[in-house]
């Protein structure tokens, strides 16, 4: 198996044992939600939520059902996000993990619904929410129904904030478009994986628009950290411990009922 960055070859087991991170250049390869669940959560603690929600082709876009079927086969998922409850080093958390292999991680009505439900559950039950974001943006095959999810997920994130329940975001490669312009930038802590592409429009679109070559590293996680767009960069091997610390640091008083704000 070749690293897409440095092109050095290793047995696939080497990549798997290293959480799909290249031992030579530290390139973080794109991985699937169930792989993340294995290294991030306590053994057998993940319980999937809302597994049967599926899109119904709301605007009857021709060929959409075929694209969904092909994506299901490619990603072994029925949508571009998995949501569930879990424990991370004994701490309770609600977890959403997006898949770029399912139609580019595009956010349609079901992705927005599952993420919104998860955040509202976190607000009601006062459980921290962690979202692993990776997406090419809104799902154009669902038209305005897709764009509506930006407001919907942002509203759910605001509910978490109102209830004082922490929302943690991990930006993975790539995170762009409508996901970047909505819930992915609304966390109490916004972290990123090394080298992740993060922005609204991708670099090729920007270069084609302004007809100029962008500087090396533009929109990568390290660039965004330097500009204050993300709070920290967390290597994959450290993410389990990182989220355990974040939950501890931000969860004081979660068992208490928040006081109502005076009108």
Curated annotation (Swiss-Prot):
Keywords: ATP-binding, Cytoplasm, Fatty acid biosynthesis, Fatty acid metabolism, Lipid biosynthesis, Lipid metabolism, Metal-binding, Nucleotide-binding, Transferase, Zinc, Zinc-finger
Cofactor(s) the record lists: Zn(2+)
Keyword Manganese recorded: no
Pfam families on file: Carboxyl_trans (PF01039)
Entry keyword ATP-binding: yes
CoA carboxyltransferase N-terminal domain span: 1-263
Main location class: cytoplasm
Record note on cofactor: Binds 1 zinc ion per subunit.
GO biological process: fatty acid biosynthetic process; malonyl-CoA biosynthetic process
Compartment(s) where it occurs, according to its Swiss-Prot or TrEMBL record: Cytoplasm
EC category name: transferase
Binding site for Zn(2+): 3, 6, 22, 25
Subunit structure: Acetyl-CoA carboxylase is a heterohexamer composed of biotin carboxyl carrier protein (AccB), biotin carboxylase (AccC) and two subunits each of ACCase subunit alpha (AccA) and ACCase subunit beta (AccD).
Record's protein name: Acetyl-coenzyme A carboxylase carboxyl transferase subunit beta
Organism: Treponema denticola (strain ATCC 35405 / DSM 14222 / CIP 103919 / JCM 8153 / KCTC 15104)
Gene symbol of the encoding locus: accD
């Amino acid at each position: 198996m070749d690293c897409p960055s440095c092109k050095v070859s290793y047995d696939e087991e080497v990549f798997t044992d290293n959480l799909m991170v290249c031992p030579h250049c530290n390139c973080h390869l794109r991985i699937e939600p169930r792989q993340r669940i294995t290294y991030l959560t306590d053994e057998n603690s993940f319980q999937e939520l809302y597994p049967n929600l599926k899109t119904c082709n709301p605007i009857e876009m021709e060929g959409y059902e075929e694209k969904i079927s092909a994506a299901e086969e490619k990603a072994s998922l029925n949508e571009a996000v998995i949501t569930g409850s879990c424990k991370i080093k004994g701490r309770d958390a609600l977890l959403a993990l997006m898949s770029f292999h399912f139609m580019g991680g595009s956010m349609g009505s079901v992705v927005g619904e599952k993420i919104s439900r998860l955040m509202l559950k976190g607000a009601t039950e006062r459980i921290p929410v962690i979202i692993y974001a990776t997406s090419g943006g809104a799902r154009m095959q669902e038209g305005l129904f897709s764009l509506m999810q930006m407001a919907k997920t942002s509203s759910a994130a605001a509910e978490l904030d109102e209830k004082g329940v922490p929302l943690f975001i991990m930006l993975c490669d790539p995170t762009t478009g409508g996901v970047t312009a909505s819930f992915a930038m609304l966390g109490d802590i916004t972290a990123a994986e090394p080298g992740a592409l993060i922005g609204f429009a991708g670099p090729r679109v920007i270069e084609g628009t302004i007809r100029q070559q962008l500087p090396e590293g533009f929109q990568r996680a390290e660039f965004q950290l330097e500009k204050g767009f993300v709070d920290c960069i967390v290597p994959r091997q450290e993410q389990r411990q990182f989220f355990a610390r974040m939950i501890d640091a931000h969860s004081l008083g979660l068992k208490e009922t928040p006081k109502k704000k005076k009108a």
